[in-house]
Amino acid sequence: MAQADMVRISVCYARPDSVFLKEFDVLQGTTIAAAIVSSGVQQVCPEIDPSTMRVGIYGKLKTPDTVVRTGDRVEIYRALTADPKLARRRRVQKTRESGTREGQKWLRGGA
């Protein structure tokens, strides 16, 4: 197998407490799904279910059948643990309760 038939990629999965990142070579024409299996991430992070988790390349959502290219970073995305709107409301409320000028800027009649 010639070196020209290989592409260098990395697979990344972030847990709240650690990050899996592996850089390796795969055959040209390898899909994202095959790259994930080849990386061994499922042995290190058994909670990964490729059939339900979203995947992407450098922050752009892709389908598992997308073919990887040299230099791609395949990312496996976890489900959100908190509603982003609710989390933002809590942060704003906490800032407002602190009594700082920053916390008052969005209130009517605020500074």
Curated annotation (Swiss-Prot):
Region (Disordered): 88-111
Family (UniProt): Belongs to the UPF0125 (RnfH) family.
Protein name: Protein RnfH
A Pfam match: Ub-RnfH
Gene3D superfamilies: RnfH-like
Ranges annotated as biased composition (Basic and acidic residues): 94-105
Xref: PANTHER family: UPF0125 PROTEIN RATB (PTHR37483:SF1)
InterPro entries: Mopterin_synth/thiamin_S_b, RnfH, RnfH_sf
